Amino acid sequence: MFCHLHCMLVVFSLLLTLTGSFVNAQTTEVVTEITATTADPPDPCASNPCTIASTHCVAAGESHTCECRPGYFETNGNCTVAQQFAGSFSVTQVGGSNVLYSADLADTDSAAFASLAADVEDALDTVYQASTMADIYLGSEVWGVPEWLYRGRLHVLFATEDAGQPVLVNSTDATEAFTTALAAEAANLGITIDDSTITVSDFDECASADDNDCDPNANCTNTAGSFTCECDTELYDNSPNTEEPGRVCIAPCDPGLCTRPNEICNNGGTIEDDNLCKCIEGYDYTQYGDCDPMARSTDFRCYHCEDSIDNVKCNGRMESENGTARQCPNPTDTCYQTIQMNPEGDGFMIRKGCMNLEDCYDLLYSYEADPAKASCFEYIFPYGQDTPPGPGVQCHYCCSEYFPLDLCNYDSIHFIYGTPRINSWDPRMNWDLSMNLDATEEPESGSQRHLPVCGVLSLVVTTLLALMLH
């Protein structure tokens, strides 16, 4: 459960510089300057090595330990959420005589306090472990005996499955067991305990930041047996576990940024990997920049091309699909029937994003590339062959960062024996050799022409066919 990591040694360098060494008739002087620099030691917790949600990393020199988060307690090697009670009692007599307070009891490091605490904790363990609460009892701890009153303060823990569980132990049951334990211990020690001073009440985890794991910018609310956290109203809740909100609160974006529905700041509004905004969990960007619900494995929809006001475009996208819609080679054309818009089986689905050309080529033959997500799909090779002469097509979304989004998918044409180029994200496959290439928009003078993938492949296939005929 608890792990240790030996990290890099502290770098300590000595620079020995002979700044002056000369001899003359009167004196001989050797000046030696030593400059020592010590590099900052690496943070062993920087990589977030504690992956279990109930733990957090605690640096220990060049190593680290994974300890239970505040509000969790270690039991049998696991960190468990505990229902906590605060108990107290007063001792009035010892050996039949009234109590004279011992200053040693105020010192939690003293032998007197350690002895009394151990006796009381053992008695509580014996009673609770013999009760109906044995399965969930975690332990007790004597916190102190304040000088102003011979009154012990205790902490009693009961396990729950998670912080949202209802109260499993009420204070009445806990008090009865507590009273029984103290009575037995009082008889063994020859002390008298004032029953009217025995209390067991819900522990307030919000009283100290050490007892809860709420974000510093969240409001902690004590509940029966637990606590809840809620981010301040002006902050966004970015907690990794949706069932435990208020653990990570981030600042909102500057006004005017990340304003689309279901869109939030990424990393608290700081730019990292050129992605300032992101969709909330369960949503993803569409080709129009909207955050729509992500696809389910059964969601798919083919494309149908039809005339539009500005030009012939492909539409009919499913809500969870994203990318750049390509132009259609013909005024109307139905999509290739065996291609589906789903992440499994035939067809593929992509994520929004562009990468530069060098990165694109490095990832051409990878089944998964970030930010592209794709899978191979089945297709019919031209001329009626059952299989293509090359390997299966791996469709990745690659494009040049220098081209606008609407031309993004037409950069870096790549094909294998007439099969679709790697960065063609459109699931539609059309091998019609009579496509109307004039349906695409003409580029501005001096710019590179980017043809639709089917048009490019038609030229390739036509050229190959012409060569074969000759």
From Swiss-Prot:
Membrane topology: Lipid-anchor; GPI-anchor
Maturation propeptide residues: 447-470
Sites carrying sugar chains: 78, 170, 219, 322
Cysteines joined through disulfide linkages: 45-57, 50-66, 68-79, 206-220, 214-229, 231-249, 253-265, 258-277, 279-291
Main location: membrane
TM ranges: none
Alphabetically ordered keywords of this record: Cell membrane, Cell projection, Cilium, Disulfide bond, EGF-like domain, Flagellum, Glycoprotein, GPI-anchor, Lipoprotein, Membrane, Repeat, Signal
GO CC terms: motile cilium; plasma membrane; side of membrane
Coiled-coil residue windows: none
GO molecular function, one term: calcium ion binding
Stretches assigned to the SEA domain: 81-205
Tissue specificity comment: Sperm.
CDD domains: EGF_CA
Protein name, entry field: 63 kDa sperm flagellar membrane protein
Organism expressing this protein natively: Strongylocentrotus purpuratus (Purple sea urchin)
